[in-house]
């Protein structure tokens, strides 16, 4: 397969279906997006590295200045980035920088918890570039968690979320490391995006009650992530219990219980899984 140098990776826009989860999980994910995440910062840094739009393509000074102002806000308040990004898109609707602007807006709306606008920004990002693994991997994870099961056209939206994940997994191995990029950081970034894709697939499998498949996907998610998501450990433990892998469930719940807003719930579930391991026939 021919390696690709991804300049403006993109995503496939769509929605997903959330399985019935406890309030604790939704509280946990909202806690994670309430402040800027490592993924969010990485996306802004990627945008900064792509400031050069290529030889022979002219940009006026006002446009370039507005884009630089957006990138300068990359480590600050996401609400500020949103204002700068929306202003840029309104003022320069045909800008060559728009793929990056909509990528920044997608991640910024994610950390602000604005699901609808996150989807809208992502839709525009994919229209401008179909291989944006930054945005695609983010939505592959977020969509199945953030859209309720009562959403209209739920089955279709679930399929779309699944497509994001598979496309991410397909593209990332073909990416060529930029010449000045650190090898370890490049691998870390790729693995973190793959982890998001596998997390999304695991959640989708949970919704379909395919618990063995969910175990496979969620195990990959926690193994690939540089900082595994406690929600993935929670879901993995739940899939383990459903498949009668009680000892594995104990291990997953104990990882989930190490920290975060799900800690108390995971401790209780770990104790329950221990009881199941002693009293039931497991695998």
Mark where each language-model region is:
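N-terminal leader/linker segments that initiate helical-solenoid repeat arrays
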Residues: 25-100, 283
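Structural register within alpha-helical repeat arrays
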Residues: 68-69, 105, 139, 194, ...
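Short solvent-exposed coil/turn linkers within tandem alpha-helical repeat scaffolds
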Residues: 91-98, 128-133, 173-184, 188-192, ...
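Residue-level recognition of tetratricopeptide repeat
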Residues: 107, 141, 145-148, 203, ...
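Terminal, low-structured helical/coil segments at or just beyond the last alpha-helical repeat
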Residues: 178-180, 191-207, 242-283
């Amino acid at each position: 397969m021919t390696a690709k140098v991804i300049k403006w990776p993109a995503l496939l826009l769509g929605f997903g279906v959330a399985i019935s989860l406890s309030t604790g999980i939704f509280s946990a994910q909202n806690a994670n997006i309430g402040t800027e995440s490592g993924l969010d910062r990485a996306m802004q840094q990627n945008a900064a590295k792509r400031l050069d739009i290529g030889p022979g393509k002219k940009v006026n000074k006002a446009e370039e200045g507005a884009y630089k102002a957006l990138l300068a806000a990359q480590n600050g308040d996401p609400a500020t980035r949103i204002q700068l990004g929306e202003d840029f898109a309104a003022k320069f609707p045909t800008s060559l920088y728009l793929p990056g602007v909509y990528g920044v807006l997608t991640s910024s709306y994610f950390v602000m918890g604005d699901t609808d606008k996150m989807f809208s920004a992502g839709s525009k990002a994919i229209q401008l570039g179909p291989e944006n693994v930054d945005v695609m991997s983010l939505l592959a994870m977020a969509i199945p968690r953030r859209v309720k099961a009562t959403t209209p056209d739920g089955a279709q939206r679930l399929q779309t979320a699944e497509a994001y994940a598979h496309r991410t997994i397909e593209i990332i191995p073909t990416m060529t490391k930029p010449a000045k990029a650190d090898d370890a950081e490049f691998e870390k970034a790729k693995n973190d995006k793959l982890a998001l894709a596998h997390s999304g697939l695991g959640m989708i499998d949970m919704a379909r009650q395919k618990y063995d498949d969910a175990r496979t996907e969620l195990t990959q998610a926690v193994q690939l992530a540089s900082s595994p998501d406690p929600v993935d450990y929670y879901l993995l433990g739940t899939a383990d219990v459903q498949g009668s892998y009680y000892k594995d469930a104990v291990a997953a719940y104990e990882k989930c219980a190490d920290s975060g807003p799900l800690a108390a719930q995971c401790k209780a579930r770990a104790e329950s899984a221990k009881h199941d391991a002693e009293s039931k026939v497991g695998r």
